[in-house]
């Protein structure tokens, strides 16, 4: 059974990739094993795709371009981005992003469900 999804809910503020991006210092990056670096890459690219789905970007962040090219090096936190001491605001932004991603996926599931129901109805008519 499908659950109702409200499409009228709007975010109070736009979510940007920088709101959910994580940056490591050179020292932190140096102690990461390859599997951790690969996980970091995958998570950052997934976060970017989710943000881009909800709020289409005007340009691709340098971190994302770097990761897509397969380069493995640390990035320092850009000026104006949340500091680690302000993790709470970043976490709230991340949760908002996940909420809207969930809503978008729910809408897509509903659309796909209707398509399959209509397809079944069409096939039943053709058989009759």
UniProtKB/Swiss-Prot annotation:
InterPro entries attached to this UniProt entry: KRAB, KRAB_dom_sf, Krueppel_C2H2_ZnF
Protein name as annotated: KRAB domain-containing protein 1
Transmembrane segments annotated in the record for this chain: none
Residue ranges occupied by any KRAB domain in the UniProt entry: 15-86
This protein's encoding gene: KRBOX1
Pfam family, one: KRAB
SUPFAM superfamilies, per the entry: KRAB domain (Kruppel-associated box)
PROSITE patterns: KRAB
GO biological process: regulation of DNA-templated transcription
């Amino acid at each position: 059974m499908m659950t109702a999804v409200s499409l009228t809910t709007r975010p109070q503020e736009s979510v940007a990739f920088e709101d959910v991006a994580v940056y490591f210092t050179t020292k932190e990056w140096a102690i990461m094993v390859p599997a951790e670096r690969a996980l970091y890459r995958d998570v950052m690219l997934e976060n970017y795709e989710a943000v881009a789905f909800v709020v289409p970007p005007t340009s691709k962040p340098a971190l994302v371009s770097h990761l897509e090219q397969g380069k493995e090096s640390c990035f320092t936190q850009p000026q104006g981005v949340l500091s680690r001491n302000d993790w709470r605001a970043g976490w709230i932004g991340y949760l908002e992003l996940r909420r809207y991603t969930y809503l978008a996926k729910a809408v897509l599931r509903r659309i796909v469900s209707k398509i399959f129901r209509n397809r079944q109805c069409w096939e039943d008519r053709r058989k009759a």
